[in-house]
Amino acid sequence: MKFDNEQLLKYIGACTSPYHTVDTSLQMLLDSGFIELSLEDEWQLDSGSYVVNVFGTTLFAFHIGKKPEHTLRIASAHTDFPAIRVKPNPITSMKGYTKLNVEMYGGLIENTWLDRPLGAAGTVVLKGKNAFDVDSVLVDTKRPIAIVPNLAIHMNRSVNDGVKLNRQKEMLPILMMERSNEDNPTKALNYRNNPSLFPESDSQYDEWTKFLADEVDCDPSEILSYEMTLYPTEQGCVLGTEGDFISSPRLDNLTSCFGVLSGIIQAKKMNFNGIRCAILFDNEEVGSRTKQGGAGMILPNLVKRVYDALGYSNQEMDSFISKGFMISSDVAHGLHPNYPEKNDITNIPVLNKGVALKIACSQSYAGDAKAIAIVKGLCEEADAQYQIYVNRSDIPGGSTVGSISAAMLPERTIDVGLPLLAMHSARELMGAADQEQLNRLMNHFLGGK
């Protein structure tokens, strides 16, 4: 059966913030028969498939086979991506324009965000019964609400020579034209005559708070806080005269999330011995050092809770971990045809040639000789194409969560990922044949013997 990239694009289109990535992924697993657990409850486990929402932006799913002591296999990815985040108290004005005060999340390529229609997605937290019992609501505008316009070439003749953007000044999106009570004479007159009839006046809540209140359908006074991401509203697409490519926002790292989810669903279907786990971390793009990130204790704590609930001792658990294996999936740099000198001279991954096995002697990518051999064998057994990626010796690449999480859970680990062009652009490019190869690897790793 031909692999359906439209399912990948549909998934990416729904995952417009880390919160929505977890929500969409959780629903996929629940629809596949996984049982949802809570971090706050005591777990009673038996053979079966389970999923845990971790603080809203990280997801942990696992399948317990008939004999759980046989193997521990873990596949990981991350739910976050470079983006523009809205600051608190974000409304600022300039000569009739209403702008949003924002900050950059992760290492995005700034100029690729200019002139793009931007939507907003994330979570809004509302007042609850008391300070500790608040309500969180997911929000996705699903329509463009803001834009960061470029400066015309007539006002910047050197723009094509390269421009460094000031994030605080030149990356602020326009939200709307300023409004005032004078724009609505009836409202203005009524407010002057009877201000008590308008307790939620324009001076009390800014335009952003009122906008969020409209999206959530609540009173502005109920909103306590939010985490909102701006995202390009253009959808991903297959392109090229022969349909060879996929152009889309957020390929880093939703391609990996999609592959890992495919694998853990396959684990449930096949029900082999051992414990098979999938974890989608948050905050990889900003260093992972958070409660829900790969540099925290969340993965070892979750694994321990699984083995505790099954009645195993710490010593038995340590033994299973030492015999286990983890694949960390994050994208790699494919050969760019306009910049071929940027890649290594002998280890050159290209689009549409399969999964890249990422190797770095600095351990910025996790792996050792045995781990590399194991994943090559898995690819061959799964009939999944693979290739080798190593950075140029004089151009350090990025790091990812593989080495970080392996340091917290000492299990043999390898970093893999799909080759991309334009990584961290507002719109990235991948090979249309490659997602199938990653899914094959993950299906075999988590769902195979």
State what each model feature region is.
Residues 1-449:
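N-terminal hydrophobic/helix-forming segments and targeting peptides
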